[in-house]
A protein has these predicted regions:
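Structural motif
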Residues: 4-6, 139, 222
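Active-site donor-nucleotide binding/catalytic segment of nucleotide-sugar enzymes
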Residues: 78-87, 122-194, 247, 257
């Protein structure tokens, strides 16, 4: 008798979101009626999912091993170790699908993210409050930092080279404000802009959960960000977005075929694949240092893309 599977998911929330289409396909195609999903980094993205929510467990769930896992095949998912992924043949969502369903590269639907009325209202209310307070008609959500960002001795360091440079962040915010946009900064920590000479107040919401962030992005006029969670949320809620990539490949981490996603690839000419979760390659980290640094012309393109002038 074939045992049911327990799929273990780890990593950031963006990875968890990207696993959803493959898990939906597994439910449709496998005949495994009792499979479960075990999340090592939280279950928020699955809340309210019409078919997967009831199958999802935190890894600290009481008696999970005794009641479930002991009679199941445990599968640890790692899309970065899929050949098609590290050879730039597929997206992370497709890599999950190859791992889980073994059907090769195929089109997948966007992840199902069901937001509650309360979450939607919270997001809409925050956007409207920002518009009213800053006296602007349009709002951009800006996520400049990737998951690897660190704040060291007053400076921002991202060894994965996915985040915007701080000087460019300030310049972009200034120019968006000059175009009469209010800016909501999406960040896991507070950032000091006192010396940035910004024309308008910068909205920096605190203690906002990822589901409310999805709603904020939904009701904003545009999302601007790097290779991080926000771009995946924007894709899920069909928001117009501009995604700036550096050390990572758009085909792997973003949505180059989506009409409402604009990608500015800073690393197109110089980048090599960094084998994250496979091997440690300090040479590539050093090579990619500064890959996200922008000159004035590039910042102009970013602003034109966000404001719809390009």
């Amino acid at each position: 008798m074939q045992r049911s599977k327990a799929f273990f998911l780890n990593g950031g929330t963006g990875r968890l979101l990207c696993a959803i289409p493959a898990l939906e396909k597994y439910l449709e195609e496998s005949g495994d009626e009792n499979f479960i999903i075990v999340c090592e980094g939280g279950t928020d993205v699955f809340k309210g999912h019409p078919t997967l929510d009831k199958r999802v467990y935190d890894n600290w769930h009481k008696d999970l091993f005794r009641d479930k896992l002991v009679n199941m095949d445990v599968i640890s998912l790692e899309p970065y170790r899929v050949w098609e992924y590290y050879n730039q043949k597929c997206s992370i969502a497709q890599a999950f699908d190859i791992e889980i369903n073994n059907k090769g590269i195929r089109p997948l639907p966007k992840p199902t993210l069901r937001l509650s009325k309360d979450e939607l209202l919270s997001g809409r209310q925050l956007v409207n409050e920002v518009k009213e307070k800053i006296k602007k008609d349009k709002v951009v959500v800006f996520q400049p930092f990737g998951r690897g960002i660190e704040h060291i001795d007053g400076s921002f360091v991202d060894r994965s080279n996915r985040s915007f440079e701080f000087r460019d962040i300030k310049n972009i915010i200034r120019r968006l404000q000059d175009k009469n946009y209010a800016v909501i900064l999406m960040s896991e920590f507070g950032v000091d802009f006192k010396e940035a000479n910004l024309k308008d107040e910068l909205a920096m919401p605190e203690n906002v959960g990822i589901r409310v962030w999805a709603a904020i992005i939904k009701y904003a006029d545009h999302f601007l960000g790097c290779d991080s969670l926000g771009q995946h949320l924007a894709y899920c809620v069909d928001s117009k977005s501009t995604v700036v990539t550096g050390s990572t490949f758009p085909i792997n981490v973003s949505y180059p075929d989506c009409k409402h996603v604009n990608i500015l690839d800073m690393g197109e000419l110089e980048r090599e694949y960094s084998p994250i979760r496979i091997a440690v390659d300090e040479r590539l980290d050093r090579k990619h240092e500064g890959i996200m640094s922008m000159n004035d012309d590039i910042i102009k393109v970013v602003i034109e893309t966000v404001t719809g002038k390009k």
